[in-house]
Swiss-Prot record:
UniProt-annotated binding residues for substrate: R87, R93, N125, R156
NCBIfam families: MalateDH_bact, PRK06223.1
UniProt modified residues of type Phosphoserine: S149
Taxonomic superkingdom: Bacteria
List of residues binding NAD(+): G12, A13, G14, F15, T16, G17, D36, N100, L123, T124, N125
Pfam families noted in UniProt: Ldh_1_C, Ldh_1_N
Keyword list, A-Z: NAD, Oxidoreductase, Phosphoprotein, Tricarboxylic acid cycle
Catalytic reaction equation(s): (S)-malate + NAD(+) = oxaloacetate + NADH + H(+)
Role description: Catalyzes the reversible oxidation of malate to oxaloacetate.
Organism: Bacillus cereus (strain ZK / E33L)
InterPro entries the record matches: L-lactate/malate_DH, Lactate/malate_DH_C, Lactate/malate_DH_N, Lactate_DH/Glyco_Ohase_4_C, Malate_DH_type3, NAD(P)-bd_dom_sf
EC number: 1.1.1.37
Active-site residues annotated for this sequence: H180 (proton acceptor)
The name this protein goes by in its record: Malate dehydrogenase
Length: 312
């Protein structure tokens, strides 16, 4: 008898992709197919086998395979894209656009061919533009092509707030809107610690410093690593989104969604609060923004559109 589980394919077997695959398997969310280019097929198979051999120790039942053949990804429920060239110290997100856009288009054609009903979650940077590129190439409904940045950016924001207050991170809630870059918009007014507004707990200048650190969060880790970029928190964020989809949890999460008039913008992907469930993005939630918040979001949108101009 064949065991029928959900199926998730992770494209890109680097640090983020491999970590995502392992976390998905550990949580028994799905069988996992880890995919990379033919030149890296053996290392990809090796990573997958290594993860599988951890299953008796970690106590999880999930099959994991490594491959370079997209036929192995057929009929995936969710496809997570982490592939692309890595961001290096001093490299702007704009520098990544041309190369990663070509990579996205090639990957997307294979996904659409083998898993036409899948939901695609994109991580590859610059993620707002890359998600748009995938959407245009796939021809999927907008609800089924989603970018990941807000969960990660919000996680960083929550981490820094918890450290500042010496509170549990479990009790910190918040939202980060906009593009995944230096112009992202952490919404302090919609952020709480145990239901208490942050503005009543943390002095304004400290909050501003935390907001600024959140904006530079990815760059901070890139600088510390010296080579490569963050992968544990990005992988955990991808898994949270994938779990919400596979289990139809209808989670309220920040995600990169295609806008058609929401917040006053159209024809771009931008980080906004959404309801994430079995159909992908079930609904975009429009928050009322103050004038300064809307101005900040406008700047973020301008940055995203400037990156999109480089799309090939």
């Amino acid at each position: 008898m064949t065991i029928k589980r959900k199926k998730v394919s992770v494209i890109g077997a680097g640090f983020t992709g491999a970590t995502t695959a392992f976390l998905l398997a550990q949580k028994e969310l799905a069988d996992v197919v880890l995919v990379d280019i033919p030149q890296l097929e053996n290392p990809t198979k090796g990573k997958a086998l290594d993860m599988l051999e951890a299953s008796p120790v970690q106590g999880f039942d999930a099959n994991i395979i490594g491959t370079s053949d997209y036929a192995d990804t057929a009929d995936s429920d969710v496809v997570v894209i982490t592939a692309g060239i890595a961001r290096k110290p001093g490299m702007s997100r704009d520098d990544l656009v041309a190369t990663n856009s070509k990579i996205m288009k090639s990957i997307t054609r294979d996904i659409a061919k083998h898993s036409p009903n899948a939901i695609i979650v994109v991580l590859t940077n610059p993620v707002d533009a890359m998600t748009y590129s995938v959407f245009k190439e796939a021809g999927f409904p907008k609800e089924r092509v989603i970018g990941q940045s807000g969960v990660l950016d919000t996680a960083r924001f929550r981490t820094f707030i918890a450290q500042e207050l010496n509170f549990s991170v479990k009790d910190i809630t918040g939202f980060v809107l906009g593009g995944h870059g230096d112009d992202m918009v952490p919404l302090v007014r919609y952020s709480y610690a145990g239901g208490i507004p942050l503005e009543t707990l943390i002095p304004k200048e400290r909050l501003e410093a935390i907001v600024e650190r959140t904006r530079k969060g990815g760059g901070e880790i890139v600088g510390l690593l010296g080579n490569g970029s963050a992968y544990y928190a990005p992988a955990a964020s991808l898994v949270e989104m994938t779990e919400a989809i596979l289990k139809d949890q209808r989670r309220v999460l920040p995600a990169i969604a295609y806008l058609e008039g929401e917040y006053g913008y159209s024809d771009l992907y931008l980080g906004v609060p959404v309801i994430l469930g079995g159909n992908g993005i079930e609904k975009i939630i429009e928050l009322e923004l103050l004038a300064d918040e809307k101005e900040a979001l406008d700047r973020s949108v301008e940055s995203v559109r400037n990156v999109m101009k480089v799309l090939v």
